[in-house]
Design a protein with these regions (language model features):
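An acidic/histidine-cluster motif and surrounding catalytic segment
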Residues: 1-124, 135-188
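Short active-site segment of divalent metal-dependent hydrolases/proteases
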Residues: 129, 133-134
């Protein structure tokens, strides 16, 4: 398992105006809905497109959408935070293949999208891109890391047809770092 702050992952983009490569790596995707309220927003092809845009290597990713209770339990257990958060990234490998679980808390995502005045689709796309970048070693604990990660997210989301998420009314919503994860055997 790799901590989210690792820096040896080669960047695909150097700044927010960089072009996004058109060739996208293979993705093995599993979608789980413990909370199905936004299932219609998270169609398999959309989720795969959003994740592939952010990936620099082949990947095996599980996306799990949970309710407040499970989101709180996971954030408390793995980050020591007594609240549910929007996205948790559990990265198990990032080279040569990315292996990760992304956990999205539907009630938190819904509240944030409403507070930011953005669509659920745009916010989910942002959080999935954000989580995929964490799975590849990006982090935002330090200002320079945050600037690099935000520039990458912005470029990718604009390439996908979404607005800059950091220009919205509630700039810098708390994003969950992915520094801890449970041990897991590799899927093969």
């Amino acid at each position: 398992m790799r901590a989210s702050g690792a820096s040896e992952v080669a960047p695909r983009l150097t700044n927010a105006t960089a072009t996004v490569p058109t060739a996208q790596p293979p993705l093995q995707l599993s979608l789980q809905f413990a909370d199905a309220r936004h299932r219609s927003v998270l169609g398999r092809s959309k989720v795969a497109r959003w994740l592939r845009a952010a990936l620099a290597a082949p990947a095996s990713i599980t996306v799990r959408v949970v309710g407040e209770e499970e989101g709180l339990a996971l954030n408390t257990q793995w980050r020591g935070q007594d609240h549910a958060t929007n996205v948790l990234t559990f990265a198990y490998a990032s080279q040569p293949e990315v292996e990760a679980d992304l956990v999205l808390c539907a009630p938190v995502v819904e509240r944030e999208a409403e507070a930011q005045g953005t669509s659920l689709e745009a916010h989910y796309a942002h959080l999935l891109v954000h989580g995929a970048l964490h799975a590849q070693g990006f982090d935002h604990e330090k200002p320079a890391q945050a600037q690099r990660m935000e520039a990458r997210e912005t470029a990718l989301l604009m390439h996908l047809g979404f607005a800059d998420p950091y220009s919205l009314s509630l700039r810098r919503q708390s994003m969950a770092p992915a520094s801890s994860a449970p041990p897991r055997s590799r899927r093969r």
